UniProtKB/Swiss-Prot annotation:
It comes from Bacillus cytotoxicus (strain DSM 22905 / CIP 110041 / 391-98 / NVH 391-98). HAMAP family: Homoser_kinase (MF_00384). It is found in: Cytoplasm. Its EC number is 2.7.1.39. GO terms for cellular component: cytoplasm. Keywords: Amino-acid biosynthesis, ATP-binding, Cytoplasm, Kinase, Nucleotide-binding, Threonine biosynthesis, Transferase. Pathway: Amino-acid biosynthesis; L-threonine biosynthesis; L-threonine from L-aspartate: step 4/5. It catalyses: L-homoserine + ATP = O-phospho-L-homoserine + ADP + H(+). Belongs to the GHMP kinase family. Homoserine kinase subfamily. This is Homoserine kinase.
Amino acid sequence: MIPFKIRVPASTANIGPGFDSVGMALSLYLEVIVKEEVPHWYVIHPFDQSVPNDDSNLIISTALQVCPSLPSHIIEVISNIPLTRGLGSSASAIVAGIELANQLGALHLTTDEKIHLATKFEGHPDNVAASILGGTVIGAIDEGHVSVVRIESKELGVISVIPDEELNTNESRFVLPETFSFHHAVRASSISNVLVAALCEKKWEIVGEMMERDLFHEPYRSQLVPLLPSVREYAKRFGAYGTALSGAGPSLFILTPYENRQEIAEQLMKVFPKIEVCELEIDYEGVVVNMDISVNR
């Protein structure tokens, strides 16, 4: 069984008004190579010292919450998901930890059980369900019960605009109001409802319109991401359907016609030459375990 590899896609959440509910898996990946058993957990990773390399690492701590009796191993982490940029890096780590426990502990978890555990650890299903299932997901958690629906959106292209600066999710949540008026909540939820219906019916122009009319979080978080209005304006000018914060930000998420994604990305690169612009795919595989690998390290 050893070694084996777990691959988990990145994700974007909200897609505008689908706050803490709508997520989409993206073609950036966290890979975890599980190596030999050792007396103590050890994580080889490419990040700075703020990311632990022992059992306090989020991947390992998640695995141990799922199965406390797991034997310790060396694991190597390879990732091109930027940290604290709104692209689901923590959700990917949580999903990897659950799959690590599932494989090493021979738990035979169902997909629904993985989603339930991941939502329990993350607090909301959007990112984690997307990383587990792939594709686009709409999820809800109510009194501990998690419901998720997966859809495919293969006509869509995705562009991510990734600023250099980090934005901690807790900081981004701090600017949100604790309550809304009834009238505000009705307006906000109606926009979210139309977004979801348009995603299901593949009404992409309506998706783009709704993702730019959010009332749940973007009006408050946009002050932390001053790049949003100008990127939104240019993306629309170049033919994109719509632009929104990716999760809590600071990255921006742009939906385009699939066949035009490269051209739109290239035009944005010319306008914003100092900012990373990534042409991505929607990932449709979700978490994948590969037992047929060799490790020469």
